[in-house]
Amino acid sequence: MIQLVLLVYIKEKLMKKNILTTLLAAVLYFLCVGIGVFLGHLVDQTGNMFYAPAFSALVGGSVYMLLLTKVPRFGAITTLGLFMAIFFLASKHGAGAFLPGLACGLAADAIARLGNYRDRIKNTLSFLVFAFSTSGPILLMWINPASYEAALLARGKSQEYIDRIMVAPELDKILLFVSSILLCALIGAVVGQFLSQKIADKL
């Protein structure tokens, strides 16, 4: 009886710790997205989010890999993706801009789970998928430009601003967008795995 109570207590403590770690990771990843937006603005000053997902993945890989190390359970990455989705939904980027956060978070979690969250290759593939969780605004711009423009107008943006940030869905632009995210996510994942291992070794 005492052993059962003790086991339940330990599980509850571990669950609370996992929840707090996941929430902290979500906050840190939001900061990484903010840095990604800033770096993207330095590269392209038109004001759109074209390079933000790539730079967010570059600086956010360490947070992602550390979360996999600390909470190797299904649900942590899905929760991270859910927070991304809520952010885009709350910031009124347009109907559908939140969907990549949900889809990529769930898919990335499933991929990492295939390797029990310890397989470096599967964890890397997982992050390559998750990196597209912040691509909602650009994808919506290409898939449904009318809805995207309407969302911007509803947020008080001028037509001049909208005309300036719109990116035509041309093949070279699409390839640049996808390849930049994949490349930066790969670098972010490798650096993140190295740093998370270093941190884990010291703990």
Task: Show where each model-derived region lies.
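Membrane topogenic helices and adjacent juxtamembrane segments
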Residues: 7-41, 150-176, 197, 201-202
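Hydrophobic transmembrane alpha-helices
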Residues: 15-79
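Transmembrane alpha-helical segments of multi-pass membrane transport proteins and ion-pumping complexes
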Residues: 26-37, 57, 61-65, 89, ...
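Interfacial aromatic-anchored transmembrane helix boundaries in multi-pass membrane proteins
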Residues: 37-42, 49, 84-112
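Membrane-embedded alpha-helical hairpins and interfacial helices in multi-pass inner-membrane proteins
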Residues: 49, 126-198
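Central hydrophobic cores of alpha-helical transmembrane segments
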Residues: 76-85, 122-133
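Cytoplasmic juxtamembrane interface segments
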Residues: 101-131
